[in-house]
């Protein structure tokens, strides 16, 4: 068989079913893939001479902003009246919420976090979130060791 005839037969057989494309336009979208946010927590609560002070600071390790949260007690009445309860429920630290970059924080009472500090204090699009303690209840707690456990992380609206 002639090679030319064979090529023509193959082209005719496969080319006959080729689709006709009519361009209507283009669709274009740019997506951004960001690196995972790394957080660092630094608790520094203390009681000296029956005066509570210190706080807990959570920050992004690279200074980037994120939606940050930290657990506080359900008895928290607002960002200027936070409650942080120890694991036994015997001591409550009282303070306020601070957010980096001048962000105004919020309380999400619908959050269901683990432990005694089960609602979320939040800072949207901030590099840091902190609880700042100024007092405690009871004012003169019994001598002993008190452990404060607060969940922290990022959230999506």
Model feature map: region roles:
Residues 103-107, 128-130:
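Secreted/processed peptides and extracellular or luminal domains of membrane proteins
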Residues 19-90, 119-147, 151-157:
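N-terminal small/polar-rich segments of proteins
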